[in-house]
Amino acid sequence: MKNVRELLQVNEESLPKLYCDLDQVLCAFLDGAKFVLGHDFVKSDRETRWKKIANFKGFWDNLQWMPGSRKLYQRIAKYDPYILSAYSTRDANSRTGKHKWIAKNTRVPKSRVILVKRAQKQSYATDKGEPSVLIDDYIKNIKEWEQKGGIGIHHTSVSKTLKELSNLGFK
């Protein structure tokens, strides 16, 4: 007969697919933008800020980790997560730079990196009729994800996200 510990143990194969956003979850996009712009990202018009970022060599691949996000990455890494991130249509370097950042800072293979337009994220909310999990800082993405049948974790702090992951069986 199985003991209680064995009965409560979650089978990792039964866990849902796990997707993690990049900007403001793992890497500090807004801090990088502030460095380039000399002020907060939203304090200049869209065209000006994106032009400055696009002209700043190595912007994307040299972003710093978000505070505490290495701990988050270490937790999810053992579950072979996907990185699901929106690329900027205003900066042709964003796709390549994000791939470089991921290659330099994580062990997520290129085959598990999905860069899409923001509105396309929700199309990954389920897999073969089963809900997938998305960790994302942008509440609109979480709401759209959940409306499509997925499980959303609104990332506002590493400790909160880790707790929610644990509740889902990602120990």
Regions found by a protein language model. Give the residues of each.
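Short, structured coil segments at secondary-structure junctions
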Residues: A77, P109, Q147-G149
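Conserved Lys-Pro-Asp/Glu-containing loop-to-beta segment of HAD-superfamily phosphomonoesterases
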Residues: K17, V113-I142
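Active-site neighborhood of HAD-like aspartate-dependent phosphohydrolases
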Residues: N11-K57, Q147, S157
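A short, structured active-site edge motif that brings together acidic residues
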Residues: Y82-R95, H99, A103-S123
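Short catalytic/ligand-binding loop motif for oxyanion handling, primarily in non-cytosolic enzymes
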Residues: C27-L30, F35, P81, R90-S94, ...
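Charge-dense, intrinsically disordered terminal/linker segments
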Residues: M1-P16, V25-C27, W65, K71, ...
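Acidic, Mg2+-coordinating phosphoryl-transfer loop and its flanking beta/alpha structural elements
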Residues: E130-N167
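Short, acidic loop-to-helix structural element flanking the phosphoryl-transfer center
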Residues: S44-D45, A54-I83, D91-T96
